[in-house]
């Protein structure tokens, strides 16, 4: 394997370039203590296996981190941000990923999406943003535990979605949400916005939730399709 440690990566003016781009099965790469400045994409991983990212600062980026089709990767103790319509974390098709002890902040649009993932452990993270399109997850056998989700007031808080879309929007099977905390402060004029929407799938479990949802009488929504 290869270890990369202690770098500051600076993009061109007005957020251009990618800080770290790894593609294909580059086994056992380790990235530690790396800071991104003025980047369009902080980190992009395509089809990678057993990569470790720790103590990464990709807050000064349009898109913080993007991962696709990897196996047994780890992202921990890192900072990711987004701006200008980007996404702090866009994760798709990952399996056996550990995503823990990270802080993600989205200025607008989505904070994090985990699409088509399996056996992913998302634990002890802090997610902060200001839009309804906040946290999406689909797939199966994922664990989402001990996270703090905070949605602050903003203009255009629904971001093109209906009020029942849900801050946490879940599709899939056998996903387990436990011991999470959600703070949702809704802007005036939004009628009964939903905090958690179990939109599709079966055998998803929600336990030991703390939900602080101001200005809404509709907190947890289960559509007709889940079983």
Regions found by a protein language model. Give the residues of each.
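Extracellular parallel beta-helix/beta-solenoid repeat domains
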Residues: 1-227
């Amino acid at each position: 394997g290869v270890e990369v440690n202690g770098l500051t990566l600076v993009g061109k003016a007005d957020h251009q370039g990618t800080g770290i781009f790894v593609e294909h099965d580059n086994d056992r790469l380790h990235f530690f203590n790396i800071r991104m400045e003025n980047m369009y994409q902080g980190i992009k991983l395509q089809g990678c296996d057993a990569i470790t990212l720790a103590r990464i600062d990709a807050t000064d980026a349009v898109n913080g981190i993007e991962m696709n089709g990897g196996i047994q990767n780890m992202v921990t103790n890192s900072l990711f941000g987004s701006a200008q319509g980007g996404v702090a974390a866009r994760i798709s098709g990952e399996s056996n990923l550990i995503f823990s002890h990270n802080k993600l902040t989205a200025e607008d649009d989505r904070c994090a999406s985990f699409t088509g993932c399996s056996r992913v452990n998302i634990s002890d993270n802090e997610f902060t943003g200001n839009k309804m399109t906040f946290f999406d997850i689909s797939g199966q056998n994922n664990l989402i535990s001990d996270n703090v989700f905070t949605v602050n007031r903003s203009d255009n808080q629904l971001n093109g979605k209906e009020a029942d879309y849900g801050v946490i929007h879940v599709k899939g099977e056998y996903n387990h949400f436990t011991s999470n905390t959600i703070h949702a402060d809704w802007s005036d004029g939004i009628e009964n916005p939903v905090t958690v929407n179990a939109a599709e799938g079966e055998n998803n479990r929600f336990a030991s939730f703390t939900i602080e949802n101001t200005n809404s009488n509709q907190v947890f929504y289960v559509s007709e399709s889940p079983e």
